[in-house]
UniProtKB/Swiss-Prot annotation:
It comes from Mus musculus (Mouse). One of its GO terms (biological process) is galactose metabolic process. This is Galactose-1-phosphate uridylyltransferase. Zn(2+) 2 binds at residues 202, 301, 319, 321. It comes from the Eukaryota.
């Protein structure tokens, strides 16, 4: 239909009428989706995946990591920056970060002389947790019992630091693309005297939903995704892995327990075993997607601790976020710049397309499959 003779307002109205008459397809037409957990929107522009890529290409990292490097401060027996020598650990190893962003004895900034210049005290502790004594392994290449030991250590440090601090943030940055400067398998744990911004948003959203509907937001969300199935990646007896309806990063996933669980220490032995198994499968799929050690940032969110530990916090549901940056290949990543920084998040691949691709991937790591083929060829 031609609208060339109409005035601008008529053309706008006619254009809107044409758009309404068209059949909407999420995989072809741009739209915005709401994230009820963090009270924000994301622009989905799936048609952009058809454009040729002429942007930055990251170098492929083919460097072999030595199993043990005496100069690597995370290795067993190595000397760290503060002069302390690591024990010869053979499992997980937790220690105080030598360069902490939070310290327990920081002074109070005092009162502000103007409402536009507010500062408040920030205290806490920062720890580093090594997952394994070897530098040349990552979580998907570790055994299920080894991953289970990591989960137990996560639960223990949450309980320990949560006795004093209202928020304990466990997070892993994997890969140089995510700013990880050391290839040794490890995560960080920051406990703070305040509730960080994202935790505050999740607290408000879950509290509001629970007040309005009488059930935890993420527990209900998990049930709905099990019914709809199109965004599921993995399911097990106790856990669900899915690409959220509101995902921002290309292959972002959300890891949820099937039952109502508020914090990591509440997981029973069967749930911890099952979590180790499904984590290994998810991270193997990630690596298999582009046959690379898949970079990501991940972290756990649970009910606030400290003085809130004894509170019911029934609106909270434990969950883990995985935010991987890769989009088209092992060397092409998603950049959060421009529109994302100044307006709102935007993604190209739909969450349903991402989930379908992840679902279809094998659960045997490509490195192990390659070794099996080489062994068979020799035999």
């Amino acid at each position: 239909m031609s609208h060339s003779g109409a005035d601008p307002e008529q053309r706008q109205q006619a254009s809107e009428a044409d758009a309404m008459a068209a059949t909407f397809r999420a995989s072809e037409h741009q739209h915005i989706r709401y994230n009820p957990l963090q009270d924000e929107w994301v622009l989905v522009s799936a048609h952009r995946m058809k454009r040729p890529w002429q942007g930055q290409v990251e170098p492929q990292l083919l460097k072999t990591v030595p199993r043990h490097d005496p100069l690597n401060p995370l290795c067993p027996g190595a000397t760290r920056a503060n002069g302390e020598v690591n024990p010869h650990y053979d499992g997980t190893f937790l220690f105080d970060n030598d360069f902490p962003a939070l310290q327990p004895d920081a002074p109070d900034p005092g009162p502000s002389d103007h409402p536009l210049f507010r500062a408040e005290a920030a205290r806490g502790v920062c720890k580093v947790m090594c997952f394994h004594p070897w530098s040349d392994v990552t979580l998907p290449l570790m055994s299920v019992p080894e991953i289970r030991a990591v989960i137990d250590a996560w639960a223990s440090v949450t309980e320990e630091l949560g006795a004093q601090y209202p928020w304990v943030q466990i997070f892993e940055n994997k890969g140089a693309m995510m700013g990880c400067s050391n290839p040794h398998p490890h995560c960080q744990v920051w406990a703070s005297s305040f509730l960080p911004d994202i935790a505050q948003r999740e607290e408000r959203s879950q509290q509001t939903y629970h007040s309005q509907h009488g059930k935890p937001l993420l527990l209900e969300y998990g049930h709905q995704e099990l019914l709809r199935k199109e965004r599921l990646v993995l399911t097990s007896e106790h856990w669900i892995v899915l690409v959220p309806f509101w995902a921002v990063w290309p292959f972002q996933t959300l890891l949820l327990p099937r039952r109502h669980v508020r914090r990591l220490p509440e997981l029973n032995p069967a749930e911890r075993d099952d979590l180790a198994s499904i984590m290994k499968k998810l991270l193997t799929k990630y690596d298999n997607l582009f046959e690379t050690s898949f970079p990501y940032s991940m972290g756990w969110h649970g009910a606030p601790t400290g003085l809130k530990t004894g509170a019911t916090c029934d609106h909270w549901q434990l969950h883990a976020h995985y935010y991987p940056p890769l989009l088209r290949s092992a060397t092409v990543r998603k950049f959060m710049v421009g529109y994302e920084m100044l307006a709102q998040a935007q993604r190209d691949l739909t969450p349903e397309q991402a989930a379908e691709r992840l679902r279809a991937l094998p659960e045997v790591h490509y490195c192990l499959a390659q070794k099996d083929k080489e062994t068979a060829a020799i035999a």
